[in-house]
Amino acid sequence: MRSFSSFHISPMKCKPALRVHPLCDKLQMEMDRWCVDFASPESSDEEMRSFIAQKLPFLSCMLFPTALNSRIPWLIKFVCWFTLFDSLVDDVKSLGANARDASAFVGKYLETIHGAKGAMAPVGGSLLSCFASLWQHFREDMPPRQYSRLVRHVLGLFQQSASQSRLRQEGAVLTASEFVAGKRMFSSGATLVLLMEYGLGVELDEEVLEQPAIRDIATTAIDHLICVNDILSFRVEYLSGDFSNLLSSICMSQGVGLQEAADQTLELMEDCNRRFVELHDLITRSSYFSTAVEGYIDGLGYMMSGNLEWSWLTARYHGVDWVAPNLKMRQGVMYLEEPPRFEPTMPLEAYISSSDSC
């Protein structure tokens, strides 16, 4: 079977400035200890070391650099919880390839959200117990309308996690637009945007949230997160046998090679950059612009730049010995040194172009 050998990533830029939360250094060690406490029952020692090496508290401090000091620890905990949850439901050797088991796993979290009898009871140091604690905090601390939006987003997130396993099992091929639209609606991006708003200590009026430019700038930020994550996580997902990725969708649906798929994804990312700047300028000149709106749209930009920086640095995508390219201009070559020994649901030949070099 023919396999990819490498693909080049042209310069990845992000217009919004990179910022880090001022409490980052203080919180990082504390949050690492917290990660060990809640993740250990679910993980082997090796998995635990890998989990800590992902620098998730650092990611959170770049995603939410302007969050209130009292709220940033809860945002860090949510990001850490979701990352471990996501790893479990995307594991193609387990839940990620078994729709029935994935649905049952997600069902336990749905019970917690809906407040089923006994659902909030702690279960040791488990992932579910961690989520129950987080959810109780958000339920008690968020304004009612903001909490209702959180419920909708997280229910969609769980729905997407379960349906992803079904799509893998069926060998479904999505176009790039279908893939992005699905992730945009149900991925973690929409939840993170809402948590960013909560972290600022504001609740935007529904009238403001429904403004076309506000909706568009949030969508643009989420699309940027999708493009960045999928291009920089492709290598580790490919080597694990996971083809639920934007690059894979482009290859399979269009019959193009991996380099072309990477280039298309980078072009989408650049479109997001340009669109964000245009929308930011438009909103600052609007009649509904306010200090709260300014914090919100700036926060979206910080999420974009923070996610790009972390995605280049994290061991989650590149391994613990990874040395990232130059800080000012992220670019490089992703090597696939060890071709996977498996038969994917959708044969590799179906989407490897003859133009690919090996």
Swiss-Prot record:
Record Pfam families: Terpene_syn_C_2 (PF19086)
Any GO BP annotation: isoprenoid biosynthetic process
Annotated organism of origin: Selaginella moellendorffii (Spikemoss)
UniProt GO molecular function: terpene synthase activity
Transmembrane parts of this sequence: none
UniProt protein name: Microbial Terpene synthase-like protein 13
Organism superkingdom: Eukaryota
InterPro entries per UniProt: Isoprenoid_synthase_dom_sf (IPR008949), Terpene_cyclase-like_2 (IPR034686)
Job of this protein: No terpene synthase activity detected in vitro.
Extra remark: Selaginella moellendorffii contains two distinct types of functional terpene synthases (TPS) genes, the typical seed plants TPS genes (SmTPSs) and a microbial type TPS genes (SmMTPSLs).
